[in-house]
Amino acid sequence: MTELKLIHIFTDGSCLGNPGPGGYGIVMNYKGHTKEMSDGFALTTNNRMELLAPIIALESLKEPCQVVLTSDSQYMRQGIMTWIHGWKKKGWMTSNRTPVKNVDLWKRLDKASQMHTIDWQWVKGHAGHAENERCDVLARTAAESKPTQPDLGYQP
């Protein structure tokens, strides 16, 4: 059996106004090589950008990988590690029987994570973690760039 490539992914989301213009930032490290990605959206939320960042990163991987994915979003980490199991059993409803917010992105993140072995890590934001700080700059810059791209799944 072939050993999976070990990829370190760092993600962050940003939103000015929440809702407002938003963006995501990604830093990916593999064997000393670094790739950065970011994009902005005209009207979205911080939580949607926190979810979209790992989705884009995982979807960019061309083969199954061992991933260490680090984010400062407890919402994303708790959701994918804990809450999603109950949501799926309940037909994407919360324990209060209300529809899961951002269900389009949760379904996409669930699908994107299936082919990989992922260690979901949390890091405190704005605490000097180099890759997280870089992701924050990428996400904020994308949000501040006056993006015109719509976030098609955003529902006010």
Curated annotation (Swiss-Prot):
Annotated SUPFAM superfamilies: Ribonuclease H-like (SSF53098)
Annotated positions binding Mg(2+) 1? D12, E50, D72
Q: Which PANTHER family match?
A: RIBONUCLEASE H1 (PTHR10642:SF26)
* Parts forming coiled coils: none
Q: What is this protein called?
A: Ribonuclease H
Give the matching HAMAP family: RNase_H
Quaternary structure (record): Monomer.
Q: How is the cofactor bound?
A: Binds 1 Mg(2+) ion per subunit. May bind a second metal ion at a regulatory site, or after substrate binding.
Name its cellular compartments: Cytoplasm
Its GO biological process terms?
DNA replication, removal of RNA primer
Give TM segment ranges.
none
Give the reaction(s) catalysed. Endonucleolytic cleavage to 5'-phosphomonoester
- Residues in RNase H type-1 domain copies: 3-144
Quote one Gene Ontology molecular function term: nucleic acid binding
The gene name on file is rnhA
Q: What is the originating organism of this protein?
A: Shewanella baltica (strain OS155 / ATCC BAA-1091)
